[in-house]
Regions:
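Extracytoplasmic/secreted proteins, especially bacterial periplasmic and envelope-associated proteins
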Residues: 70, 74, 90-97, 143, ...
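Acidic/polar, glycine-enriched structural segments that form the non-catalytic walls/loops
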Residues: 1-132, 174-176, 205-210
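Helix-terminus loop motifs that line ligand-binding clefts
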Residues: 116-120, 124-126, 156-211
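A conserved hydrophobic secondary-structure block that centers on an alpha-helix together
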Residues: 21, 85-88, 131-135, 145-146, ...
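Alpha-helical support elements that line or immediately flank enzyme active sites
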Residues: 97-110, 134-158, 194-203
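Secondary-structure capping and boundary motifs in well-ordered enzyme cores
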Residues: 90-91, 131-140, 185-192
Length: 211
C-alpha cells in the first residue's frame, strides 16, 4: 500500500471522479495563459498521517525552483565526496554517473517521524535519530555498493544494516530482495548476511548485533 497527500498551488474549480473506467479523479482549474500550476505530493508507506507529516516537513512551499536548487545541492554534496584526478571529461562522466546510480537505492522508507510499516503489517518506530531503509537488491549490491556506503555514508550504512535485521525479525527471516515492506524473493543467495557482517565488523554504531 501507498498513501499520499497532494497540494495544489491554487484551489481547483471543479473535481470529477470516474470509478467505471478506473479510479480516476480529474481536477479543473481556472487559469490564464502562461500561468503555472505547481502540484506537490508526498508519499508514505505507513499511513495517511505519515504522508501529511512528510509534506509538512519536506515540502512546505510551492516553489519548483527552490526544490530544484535543493535537489542539485544535495546531489552535488553527495557526489563531491569522491574526487577523481583526470582531465578526461568522458572518464569523469562515466565515474560520476556510476556513483550517482549507486546512490539511488536503498531508499529511506520511514516517515519524517520515524514510523514505518513492516512486512508484518504493523507500524514500527525507528530509534531516535535513525531511519528505516527499503529496496535492497542485495544480490547486486553486497560486493561493492554496501562496502562503499560504509565509507561514504557510515550512518546510513548502519541504518541499512539495522533495517535488514529489523525486517528479518518482523518477517521471520532476513530479506533476499525486499521492497516496500515486502519480500520479492528475487535472485539467488542470502546476501543480507555479508552486508550486516561487514557493517558490524567495521563497528558502525547503532546496530543491534545481538538481535
Amino acid at each position: 500500500k501507498i498513501w499520499f497527500e497532494t497540494r495544489f498551488s491554487k484551489p481547483f474549480a471543479e473535481v470529477e471522479t470516474d470509478t467505471v473506467g478506473g479510479h480516476v479523479v480529474t481536477f479543473s482549474f481556472d487559469t490564464h495563459a502562461g500561468e503555472k500550476l505547481v502540484v506537490v505530493t508526498a508519499i508514505s508507506g505507513t499511513d495517511a498521517r505519515g504522508a501529511h507529516s512528510n509534506i509538512v516537513a519536506e515540502a512546505p512551499h510551492d516553489s519548483f525552483e527552490r526544490y530544484l536548487a535543493d535537489a542539485k545541492s544535495a546531489w552535488n554534496k553527495a557526489l563531491k565526496k569522491i574526487e577523481i584526478s583526470t582531465g578526461d571529461i568522458d572518464e569523469k562522466t562515466v565515474f560520476y554517473t556510476a556513483l550517482y546510480h549507486s546512490l539511488l537505492a536503498p531508499v529511506v522508507f520511514s516517515d519524517v517521524d520515524g514510523r514505518y510499516r513492516g512486512p508484518d503489517g504493523v507500524v514500527h518506530q525507528c530509534a531516535e535519530g535513525h531511519k528505516h531503509y527499503s529496496t535492497f537488491s542485495t544480490w547486486d549490491t553486497y560486493r561493492a555498493a554496501h562496502p562503499l556506503y560504509t565509507i561514504l555514508e557510515p550512518a546510513a550504512a548502519a541504518d541499512m544494516a539495522q533495517s535488514l535485521i529489523d525486517f528479518g525479525i518482523q518477517n521471520g527471516r532476513l530479506p533476499v530482495w525486499n521492497m516496500w515492506a515486502s519480500e520479492t524473493d528475487m535472485m539467488i543467495g542470502y546476501h543480507s548476511v555479508p552486508i550486516i557482517v561487514d557493517a558490524i565488523l567495521k563497528k558502525l554504531p547503532g546496530i543491534d548485533a545481538e538481535a
